[in-house]
């Protein structure tokens, strides 16, 4: 994507009511105005709040919002030029129950209050395979601690990935730390019992992975 195109998308994001782009200091140096108030101030209801972390173009968030109109969805990514597409689609198609937040995943507990979130999706994250990149894996112990801060007591996590490494690493970590694995599937399109929302929604890149015959894996779990 050219720099002019990126700039155009950044500028357009500023005009979207469904896009939130707080500066880092707004999050860490004071209580962010939306923290603890996403449902009341933006969605104007008490429906379950669901996050998608590293949402990319926002395809999954938008399609989940279409599928579950009685839930509220927020796609989170540091790259606003990416989720511009999802935000624009939501406006064009009048989808009221999805919004987008531009921030680092590491700051999630600054953007959301304790017990504010019902469910979290992590879709096709960078597996950060090199050992020195372990701290950046979105299911490592430190990230799980952050997620637990904002999740309700019965909140659930979902990991959907084409990376067999990420799938295996996460399963091992969950079992090793005593978290509750509710469901695990090594190939959601070939094994029976896959949740419908896992197989009925496909991102652009997921379609490419499937054309390459890469298995798509899925884990649903609770953080203890």
Regions inferred by a protein language model and the residue ranges of each:
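Conserved SAM/SAH-binding beta-strand->alpha-helix loop
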Residues: 79
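S-adenosyl-L-methionine
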Residues: 1-49, 59-66, 87-114
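Class I S-adenosyl-L-methionine
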Residues: 177-224
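A short glycine-rich, Lys/Arg-flanked "PGG" loop and its adjoining helix->strand segment in the class I
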Residues: 139-153
């Amino acid at each position: 994507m050219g720099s002019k195109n990126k700039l155009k998308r950044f500028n357009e994001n500023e005009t979207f009511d469904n896009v939130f782009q707080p500066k880092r200091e707004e999050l860490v140096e004071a209580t962010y105005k939306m923290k603890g108030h996403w449902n009341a101030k933006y969605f104007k209801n008490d429906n379950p709040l669901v996050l998608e972390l590293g949402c990319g173009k926002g395809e999954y968030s938008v399609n989940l919002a279409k599928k579950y109109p009685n839930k509220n969805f927020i796609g989170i990514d540091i790259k606003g030029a990416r989720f511009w597409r999802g935000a624009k689609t939501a406006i064009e198609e009048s989808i009221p129950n999805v919004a987008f937040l531009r921030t680092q995943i590491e700051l999630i507990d600054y953007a959301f209050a304790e017990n504010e979130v019902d469910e979290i999706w992590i879709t096709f994250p960078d597996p950060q395979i090199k050992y020195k990149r372990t701290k950046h894996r979105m299911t490592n112990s430190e990230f799980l601690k952050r997620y637990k801060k904002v999740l309700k007591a019965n909140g659930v996590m979902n990991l959907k990935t084409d990376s067999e490494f990420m799938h295996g690493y996460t399963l091992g970590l969950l079992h090793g730390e005593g978290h509750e694995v509710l469901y695990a599937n090594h190939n959601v399109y070939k094994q029976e019992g896959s949740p419908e929302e896992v197989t009925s929604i496909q991102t652009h890149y997921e379609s490419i992975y499937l054309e390459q015959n890469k298995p798509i894996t899925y884990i649903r779990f609770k953080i203890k």
